[in-house]
Amino acid sequence: MQLRQKAREIFEKLLAKKDQLFASDKEYFINHINFTFGESFVKANSDTQKYFLIALASTLAVGGKIEFKALFQGVIKNDISPIVIKEVIYQATPYVGFARVCDFLSLCNKVFKKLNIALVLTPQGTTT
C-alpha cells in the first residue's frame, strides 16, 4: 500500500516527522497515516486546533503515551496555546482519573520546560 497524496500533505504539514514505526512497521504506519490524515481528518471537516485537541484527549483517555507524545509535537508545531493544551489534560481527570492524567501532565510539563514555556500558566478557574 502507498501513502496517499492527501494524507502525506496533511501529515507533513501538521507533524512533518515520521516516527519509529515507519522504520520498523512501514505498512502499519502507512495505513495509520492514510486513515488518520487521509480519511479521518478530511471527513471531520474540522479546523486543525479542534482536530488535534480531540486527538490528544482521546489518546490520553486510552493511555497512549507514545502516540500522545507524537501528537503533542504537532500541537506545539501548530501554535496551539499552552493554556488550551493543559485545559484538555486537566478536564480529562474526572473521566479517566488522576493516576492516568498525572503521567500525561508530567509529559506535557517536560516538553513545556524543554521549550521554555512557563509551567505555571495563568489560572483559568471560573468557579469559587
For each of these PLM feature ranges, what is it?
Residues 1-49, 69, 76-77, 101-128:
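Acidic, glycine/proline-rich low-complexity segments that act as flexible tails and inter-domain linkers
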Residues 34, 57, 91-94:
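Residues within well-ordered alpha-helical secondary structure of globular protein domains
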Residues 49-50, 84:
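Single-residue recognition of alpha-helix capping/boundary positions
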Residues 51-59, 88-89:
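Short, structured motif recognition centered on aromatic/hydrophobic residues
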Residues 58-65, 97:
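Short alpha-helix boundary/capping elements
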Residues 66-86:
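Mid-chain, well-packed structural core segment of small domains
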Residues 86-107:
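Preference for long, well-ordered alpha-helical segments
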